[in-house]
């Protein structure tokens, strides 16, 4: 599987989703720009080597994550939005309800496998709640790849952020200003369709802090 990186915007929104609902399981989607045909025989990890860059995060649900009808509605709407913006649904993230549980459960593996049907380099990201602090001193994620029909954890010591110092600084600033209170997930959108799950205000806040 190619390398995986998250932009600061994608990482921050994932962190804010968990911060808004600290006592619930939360999940969401990660989107990447549509890939151009790549040249073959590029050296692995060398100049020009391929990697997937998650440019944004779409928060889905909090609390009950296994409601299939709601997931289908979300996937359909988000897939349509992605096509309009030349994006593709390329990853899935989840934070479990129990603090010390950072392993993918059946829901996580099922949704990630569904995404992998349309995007071969799909990543499953689990949020490690034990590493979560208001200062964001360390990345809080474990990245899993689909290999031989199983989801396997990649090197936990690898830096999966495009710019970790920036992501750390901005996520800490957003947590300090309680920006998570304004974060909208798909559950919030279903409660009131005026709630925008693309979170333009948080996107602006991230850009302003860059």
UniProtKB/Swiss-Prot annotation:
Segments passing through the bilayer: none
Boundaries of every MPN domain copy: 4-150
GO cellular component: cytoplasm; EMC complex; endoplasmic reticulum; endoplasmic reticulum membrane; Golgi apparatus; membrane
Tissue specificity statement from the Swiss-Prot or TrEMBL entry: Expressed in liver, pancreas, heart, lung, kidney, brain, skeletal muscle, and placenta. Expression levels are highest in pancreas and moderate in heart, skeletal muscle, and placenta.
UniProt-annotated location(s): Endoplasmic reticulum membrane
Organism domain of life: Eukaryota
GO biological process: protein insertion into ER membrane by stop-transfer membrane-anchor sequence; tail-anchored membrane protein insertion into ER membrane
Family: Belongs to the EMC8/EMC9 family.
Subunit structure: Component of the ER membrane protein complex (EMC). EMC8 and EMC9 are mutually exclusive subunits of the EMC complex.
Described purpose of this protein according to its UniProt entry: Part of the endoplasmic reticulum membrane protein complex (EMC) that enables the energy-independent insertion into endoplasmic reticulum membranes of newly synthesized membrane proteins. Preferentially accommodates proteins with transmembrane domains that are weakly hydrophobic or contain destabilizing features such as charged and aromatic residues. Involved in the cotranslational insertion of multi-pass membrane proteins in which stop-transfer membrane-anchor sequences become ER membrane spanning helices.
Name the UniProt record assigns to this protein: ER membrane protein complex subunit 8
Origin species: Homo sapiens (Human)
